[in-house]
């Protein structure tokens, strides 16, 4: 399994898969040059971490 797959399975189990995909779209829209040549798994991981970070802040 690839890293992207593992992250997406984890996001699915946590119920945040849709939010991760939305965050991926937002990241690519914000800075297309930065994410143009970046590995998809790295973008997924960054999006997952962003969503988890927001979720943790909301819980505090």
List each model region and its residues.
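C-terminal alpha-helical interaction appendages
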Residues: 1-60
């Amino acid at each position: 399994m690839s890293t992207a797959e593992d992250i997406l399975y984890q996001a699915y189990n946590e119920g945040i898969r849709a939010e991760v995909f939305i965050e991926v779209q937002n990241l690519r829209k914000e800075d297309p040059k930065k994410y143009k040549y970046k590995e998809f798994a790295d973008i997924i991981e960054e999006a997952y971490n962003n969503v988890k970070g927001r979720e943790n802040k909301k819980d505090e």
